[in-house]
């Protein structure tokens, strides 16, 4: 399980990159607009992990959308947490769903979804989607904007 810290102790500090998600600390800060229903989006266009079988690198575009409640994620801690997967062997589905579940455990958002758009290995892209359920009524929810992978042409 990822470690949780209230506040922004990593922001503005020289912090060593965690070697694994278990060593990473996701930080949360109070939502200054807790009464408002809004969407926050984080996009990680260069997410990497390792294939658990071959040890070869896997690459993905991650799009994380969430409707905050009492907490918002501190972005530097999220960046370091996502980077901690770089040396972790895990299947695409495991990485994508785990990130979503870890964020839910830390933030307890009104709603969250994650799209993992994995680049092809072996000629086949894998897209993984996970959410906490239906979005709240009235939430402006733009498309994640990632077309299906089709290679050249």
Swiss-Prot record:
UniProt-listed SUPFAM superfamilies = Tetrahydrobiopterin biosynthesis enzymes-like
Q: What is its main location?
A: cytoplasm
Catalytic reaction list:
7-aminomethyl-7-carbaguanine + 2 NADP(+) = 7-cyano-7-deazaguanine + 2 NADPH + 3 H(+)
Which InterPro entries does the UniProt entry name for this protein? Answer: GTP-CH-I_C/QueF (IPR043133), NADPH_dep_7-cyano-7-deazaG_red (IPR050084), QueF (IPR029500), QueF_type1 (IPR016856)
Where in this protein does the record put region Disordered?
1-26
The yes or no answer to whether the keyword Cell membrane is present is: no
Pfam families, per the entry: QueF
Of the GO CC terms on this record, one is:
cytoplasm
Q: What is this protein called?
A: NADPH-dependent 7-cyano-7-deazaguanine reductase
Native species: Methylocella silvestris (strain DSM 15510 / CIP 108128 / LMG 27833 / NCIMB 13906 / BL2)
């Amino acid at each position: 399980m990822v470690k949780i810290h209230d506040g922004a102790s990593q922001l503005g500090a020289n912090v060593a990159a965690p070697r694994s998600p278990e060593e990473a600390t996701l930080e949360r800060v109070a939502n200054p607009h807790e009464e408002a229903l809004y969407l926050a989006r984080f996009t990680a266009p260069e997410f990497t992990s390792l294939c658990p079988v071959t040890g070869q690198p896997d690459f993905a575009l991650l799009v994380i959308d969430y409707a905050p409640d009492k907490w918002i994620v501190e972005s530097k801690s999220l960046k370091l947490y996502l980077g901690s997967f770089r040396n972790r062997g895990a299947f695409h589905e495991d990485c994508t769903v785990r990130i979503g579940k870890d964020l839910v455990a830390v933030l307890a958002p009104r709603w969250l979804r994650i799209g993992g758009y994995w680049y092809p290995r072996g000629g086949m892209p894998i897209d993984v989607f996970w959410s906490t359920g239906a979005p709240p009524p009235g939430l402006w929810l733009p498309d994640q904007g990632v077309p299906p992978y089709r290679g050249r042409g």
